[in-house]
Amino acid sequence: MDKKWDVVIIGGGLAGFVAANYLARNQLSILILEKNKKVGGRARTDHIRQQYFNLGPHALYKKSKAKSILEELNIQLSGKSPKKGGVLVKGNLEYTAPFTPIGLLNTSFLSWKERIEWAKVLLKVMSIQPEKLAQQTYEQWVQQTTRLANVQSLLYLLGRLSTYCHSPEKVSGMVVLLHLKAVMSGVLYLDKGWQTMIDQLHNNCVIFGGQVQTRKCIKQIVPIKQNHFKLVLSDDEVIYGKNVLSTVGPKELTQMLGEKSPFSQIDSFTKMESVMGATYDVALTQLPNPKKLFAMGIVEPIYFSVHSNYALLSDDAKNIVMHVFKYHNPNDNIDTKKVKSELEHFLEKIQAGWKNYEITSRFIPQITVNQRIPQIGDEQILQCSKNKIPGLYIAGDWASPDSILSEGAVTSGKQAAEEIIKKEKS
């Protein structure tokens, strides 16, 4: 007779492994199915020519639910926090970033009137209750908060930095402000990349009896009866489980459940858009300009940061690992050559002559950063999706009503696990 697992988890990324750790510790039989050769999802780190490349820039909020949950699971988080500051770029001009008291005094980007306004806005951000913005887009909140164009541009820039979202006219003001407050409290760059988190979660899961299978692509999820699911794989292998926890995106989940799925009836659920970007991950033997470690475009939605100054990201500690990233707007038509040229040009502005010191680099023109652009009303949509199919649970960076990125993945993974444990132990 085929084995029937207590929980089958679809996806071996951050959400899946966090859930698996809680479930396995509660003596439930766990099977994680990962479609790729390597586990980790977007938290994966690739070891390329002795350099550790995350899939673009990754930072963990220092004061966050995600960090607390990972520490609760005894995950060691080794690394340091980058200093606040850096430069802002507009055309060929550079300005001191007004993100510290000294930066605010020294920047030539803002007039004295704008500096006073900016200081007031930052204080407002730290004291605001984001939940009160549930019915506002980030753009609406910015325009209500200040009428000064330069101050608005700084808020849009910080919105991109904290959420990777370059669609202020769409994105929820509540979600952006929640993440912006977290960013302002500091972030952590991890030694040897985010794979270290995944490896620890993976090992702990296996120690507690969980099983992980890679290169397993789910073709169909079939609810047979109460507490009984059949999962059909692409090679027609069949796996049975009492509960299914899906950490794949909303569209992929809907496809797995088929046209008759209750999820297909939720129009907004199937039309959710992903947060996208382009990343240029670069390793150098040295920095042409060691003082420039962080930069962002004011008009150009581009980010640059040297991560290796705060985390060990090379087998040779002297080497430099940095990321250049472009935030895509959902309406962008992506021209791969043009995007790469933009990122290289931006990097050349900040680190002129960098190619002379290049060890290796990797350009990815379109990368999914988050599987949902968080919009007004998403909380109701996500709530509606709960209990549509008893025994089917969702988690992932898109599945939390008020969080995205690692915060959404980790918190939704724990919540789904707790719901399953409560059900199975009752």
Language-model segments: residues:
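Conserved flavin/dinucleotide-binding core of flavoenzymes
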Residues: 307, 313-426
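Conserved Rossmann-like nucleotide-cofactor binding loop
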Residues: 15, 38, 251
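Mid-domain catalytic core of redox enzymes
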Residues: 220-225, 229-320, 383
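Rossmann-like flavin
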Residues: 106-176, 188
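Dinucleotide-binding Rossmann-like beta1-alpha1 core, especially the glycine-rich loop
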Residues: 49-131, 144
